[in-house]
């Protein structure tokens, strides 16, 4: 009987200790802070040769996750400036709500626009530079921007087989001010028509489309963008091609971009990349565009550090002299 009482006492103590440990276990913090840094060495063979060390981007992300499906994000974007050392600006600042069991997430504030983040996720080499629609200026600093101020909804269905986004925004991007009473409407939809071993929101054989319809601040001229993309992504490689039609008032331009990424094995720390962008700011004017060719190889030094060596060649039409860049770039995530 004494042994039985001792056993019961030990068992009761063990259960109590386990329950107490569970109560005292550290909870995931509701707010986390992280960052992404892109830095590089660049040599350019322009008329005046240049070679520079740069920090091309430094993002600080503050993410909040709270009860009832509420999340928040604040992202600062630190960029180089010719006049001063660095410039700090706001890139994302929004609250989001995902109702319990819903496939939709509602956002308010300075939010992602539908396309740029989607394509950057597919390409996965933002460290090299901006994608074609964010790099080539037709009707502004860039044809599309990554963020804008407004409201939107993201959705995904059937394990990301279909995903999309719809927003109503000012239309001036995250660095262009608030604009006027006119607003832009933008939407994206992506459909996985064939699965692969990559079941992410960009994985598989996909057909994706985007439309952005708006008016230029002040003049009210058309500011429309239409894009179609066909992409194929597995764990080992990515292939994609897109066509973009851009209308600003009476001027229509176009962008064609194709890119690929190949990992030498699956998984592998080494990958090779290639991209071609063909830019025509006005389809009614001859020899006013340019072609950019990018090729390089990357090495994943650790989960937090990626290195990239690449060549970037920009050739204008009409006999313009090509500009070649050799770059050694690094991405740090923390």
Show which residues each predicted segment covers.
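Cleavable N-terminal export/targeting peptides
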Residues: 1-26
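Outer membrane beta-barrel
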Residues: 24-174, 179-186, 190-199, 206, ...
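Generic short beta-strand segments
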Residues: 37-41, 213, 312
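A generic structural signal for short coil/turn motifs at secondary-structure boundaries
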Residues: 44-48, 81-84, 174-177, 216-219, ...
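Short sequence motifs at beta-strands and strand-loop junctions characteristic
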Residues: 50-54, 85-87, 141-145, 179-181, ...
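Detector for outer-membrane/organellar transmembrane beta-barrel domains
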Residues: 182, 190-283
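Outer-membrane beta-barrel "beta-signal"
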Residues: 187-189, 322-334
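Outer membrane beta-barrel transmembrane domains
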Residues: 261-308, 312
């Amino acid at each position: 009987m004494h042994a039985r009482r001792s056993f019961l006492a030990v068992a009761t103590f063990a259960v109590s200790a386990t329950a107490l440990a569970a109560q005292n276990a550290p909870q995931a913090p509701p707010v986390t802070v992280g960052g992404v840094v892109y830095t590089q060495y660049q040599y350019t063979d322009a008329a005046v040769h240049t070679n520079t060390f740069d920090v091309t981007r430094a993002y600080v992300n503050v993410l909040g996750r709270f009860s009832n499906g509420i999340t928040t994000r604040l992202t600062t974007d630190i960029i180089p400036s010719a006049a001063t050392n660095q410039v700090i600006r706001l890139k994302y600042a929004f609250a989001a709500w995902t109702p319990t069991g819903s496939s939709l997430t509602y956002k308010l504030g300075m939010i992602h626009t539908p396309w740029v983040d989607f394509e950057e996720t597919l390409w996965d080499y933002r460290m090299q530079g901006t994608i074609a629609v964010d790099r080539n200026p037709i009707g502004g600093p860039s044809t599309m921007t990554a963020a804008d101020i407004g409201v939107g909804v993201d959705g995904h269905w059937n394990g990301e087989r279909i995903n999309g986004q719809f927003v109503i925004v000012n239309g001036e991007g995250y660095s262009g001010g608030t604009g006027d009473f006119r607003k832009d409407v933008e939407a994206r939809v992506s459909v996985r028509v064939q699965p692969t071993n990559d079941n992410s929101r960009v994985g598989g054989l996909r057909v994706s489309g985007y439309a952005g319809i708006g008016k230029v601040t002040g003049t009210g001229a058309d500011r429309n963008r239409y894009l179609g993309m066909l992409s194929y992504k597995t764990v080992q490689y990515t292939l994609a091609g897109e066509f973009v039609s851009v209308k600003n008032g009476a001027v229509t331009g176009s962008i064609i971009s194709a890119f690929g990424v190949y990992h030498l094995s699956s998984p592998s720390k080494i990958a090779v990349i290639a991209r071609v962008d063909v830019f025509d700011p006005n389809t009614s004017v001859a020899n006013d565009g340019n072609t950019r060719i990018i090729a390089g190889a990357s090495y994943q030094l650790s989960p937090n550090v990626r290195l990239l060596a690449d060549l970037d060649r920009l050739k204008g039409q009409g006999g313009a002299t090509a500009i070649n860049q050799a770059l050694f770039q690094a991405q740090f995530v923390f």
